[in-house]
From Swiss-Prot:
Disulfide bonds: none annotated. This is G2/mitotic-specific cyclin-A. Keywords: Cell cycle, Cell division, Cyclin, Mitosis. The keyword Cell cycle applies. It comes from the Eukaryota. Essential for the control of the cell cycle at the G2/M (mitosis) transition. Interacts with the CDC2 and CDK2 protein kinases to form MPF. G2/M cyclins accumulate steadily during G2 and are abruptly destroyed at mitosis. One of its GO terms (biological process) is mitotic cell cycle phase transition. Residues 1-29 are annotated as: Disordered. The lineage of its organism: Eukaryota, Metazoa, Spiralia, Lophotrochozoa, Mollusca. It comes from Spisula solidissima. GO terms for molecular function: cyclin-dependent protein serine/threonine kinase regulator activity. Belongs to the cyclin family. Cyclin AB subfamily.
Amino acid sequence: MSQPFALHHDGENQMQRRGKMNTRSNGLSGQKRAALGVITNQVNQQVRIQPSRAAKPKSSEFNIQDENAFTKKNAKTFGQQPSQFSVFVDPTPAAPVQKAPTSHVTDIPAALTTLQRVPLTEVPGSPDIISLEDSMESPMILDLPEEEKPLDREAVILTVPEYEEDIYNYLRQAEMKNRAKPGYMKRQTDITTSMRCILVDWLVEVSEEDKLHRETLFLGVNYIDRFLSKISVLRGKLQLVGAASMFLAAKYEEIYPPDVKEFAYITDDTYTSQQVLRMEHLILKVLTFDVAVPTTNWFCEDFLKSCDADDKLKSLTMFLTELTLIDMDAYLKYLPSITAAAALCLARYSLGIEPWPQNLVKKTGYEIGHFVDCLKDLHKTSLGAESHQQQAVQEKYKQDKYHQVSDFSKNPVPHNLALLAL
């Protein structure tokens, strides 16, 4: 039989076991354990002491490699009563002491503090107060006094009263430039003055039918005369020049100008839209793109606004002004402002109004002696208007909206200008 193997006795472990046993015997002999054990945290200890963080031990008496290191440490404290600890309680903050606010206003007079408040009384009803229940109109709309004259917005926008004098002086200088040459028809080889009269008479009808502005008509005739002053035109192309000039003037003056196809259509499709556009391009090159020119119509409207003319005076003045478009030879030698002044003076004289008051002298800078020759020519033209071959202007101003100023049976033209003391 083999002998029983010998147990290895570890002296160190034996000593530890003896220590453990002695510790247990000493702890149990002094105090017996109750049913649920002895509660070391007594109930009457209400305050918990905040445990402090223990410092890291410098070294252990046992090697970290020893598997019984933790057992040994626990063996020393097993059965011992743990140290008591308390709970940290924040101290109750004291109530803040409120200080009485300091007033920035001191020494208020007693007269102000003892004022008695008077209750508001009801305001009796007034007939001027508008009741919203009885009126459907806005209470903010107030009637203007009858004697107050309404503002002429168009006059303010177009004339700009602050710069009216500067604008007028500038246009007086501009009218001397870009003028048609008087007597240019003598240098034309294939067209005559009567052909031009027929063309302008046709353009008057076109502008009236298409409801174009009067300024558009005057601009178109200005482009025609300036173009014919520099370029010889065949009679077969004269109507094309007129249509292209009116098309250019409409694009410059009108807000919604007619389409180029309409100008080709009014020629009974004699010319195509492409031909009208090509002629427009040629006219612009010949005129060097100077299309913004002052016309007789512009000066006439400016003079009429300055003298507060009524509708009949305006219509008669415009009728006399348009008569100058037909007769080229007599009026190309006059400046547009001179022609406008003569037309206004003759219209006032025909209606029995003072022909040329001082306010017009101040406005225009003209005396009657400055335009007396144009006045005589215009008087002669108006006397022969009824017998003229071209009657478009006559028929236009026989309408009621123009007060039938071209009907000489109702508005006869003075036979002489003797009362003007010329």
